[in-house]
Amino acid sequence: MEKPTIILATSNGVGMGHLARASAIALALKEYANPIIVSMAGGIAEIPEFMGIRCEYIPGRDRMWMSREKWDEYLRDRLLALVDETGARVMSFDGVVPYPGVIAAKVSHPKLALVWVRRGLWQKKPQRFVLGLQSQMMDYIVEPGDFARAYDFGPTAERKDAQLTSSVSLFQKDTALSRDEARNVLGLDLNRPAVLVQLGTGDSDVNEKMTAALSGLLGWKDLQVILTKQPLDKDGKSLAPSGLDIRVVRHFPLARVLRAFDASVCATGYNGVHELLPALVPTVFVSNIRGTDDQEARAQWCHDMGFALRANQADLGDITATVKKLQDADVRARLSKKCAELPDPTGGAEIAKILYELAVQEEPIRPSWLRYNQLRIQEHINRGMRHVAYMGLRRLALVYRFINPHIVVQVTRQEPPIWGSQNTAQELHPLIKGEQRFEHLISGASDAYIKRRKEIAEAAYGEKIEIINTKKA
């Protein structure tokens, strides 16, 4: 029997959680299916080269290369084209809010099953109001297990529409490198302590947390401090206090080398918790309270149960003091020993099996266009009455302009996008981050697929109309 193709789509969320889960599922699928990952997250650049999984990057609407409505159509057409090219019968989506383009692709394709990989521990944000409608558009919903699920009191906690699995993680005991092997790969001294720090930078409050955390490491003899990117603010100023030996390393997946570290300081995202704790790394969690993920609840559970230390993310002094506790060898030993009690994160393999079984089943029932349009209306309402009023005024303006048209005096071609099927991080990163539009193709794309993709790009970008004279002749 030919291996079925399964598409794993992810949003461009905060951090790498969505992409890490998709990668873990894809690795488990490789044995008996052909997984393809599509994502709006820039981190997808790392996957093809290091995991041997075919991928496509899709520019998100945050790039502002087209209107929101046009981007929804663009995403739908991109996904449908990929389904037609690969013969995929199942597509999963890992993200808080399934984009209208994702659901429209499902509604438009008679044989495509749509699975929502819906993480729990939501904060009570406006997204919860469309949860019911979104769920009804799915053929199947999977909830990746969370160590801290007992502290989940968010909008998904009481729902009965999802299949709960074990937690999903790229860290697996059997494939992770030993301490010395990992240190050799990263170029670290075998005989000096090493701490991994994974906190974001950007806005001033986030930068202050980074500085506070690094300050807690001062005085640790012979310490190697490992970051995944330079600790700089937007003006290029260092956020690190003097006196630390800081090294920046890039390695994907980082889960493979976590045994290199004596301790860690990390945000309390799904990815960090379900990689660091199974790797038995003593950790201080400093929550990022933005986004939908309830990181504070997860951090509190880890702290209360004795698996990690929680720093008060709103108190810089507490962050420094809590991180300083990691310098105590007894504290580190206690945390590491406690983490050994956690169950193995086998959810990637469990979800892979669910997706495979759906792929070999009869075709799913398609949700109705009526239900889809209900969801679109509810989405606009949830964005606020001001947005609804704006949409109404915009429609009226379009009607008025149809009756009283401008004189168009200049039509210019948009700059053509860069096309390519690059599959190394070195090639992909600058293209994904660049200002010129980038249209990424899966490796081995057919001529028909390339032709269809160019039609989609033309419809999305097309021509730019410049109006000089707004009066009728």
Question: Locations of the language-model features?
Answer:
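C-terminal amphipathic helix plus adjacent low-complexity
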Residues: Q327-F402
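Conserved nucleotide-sugar phosphate-binding/catalytic loop shared by glycosyltransferases and other
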Residues: E2-V14, A28-R78
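A donor-sugar binding/catalytic signature common to diverse glycosyltransferases
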Residues: H251-A297
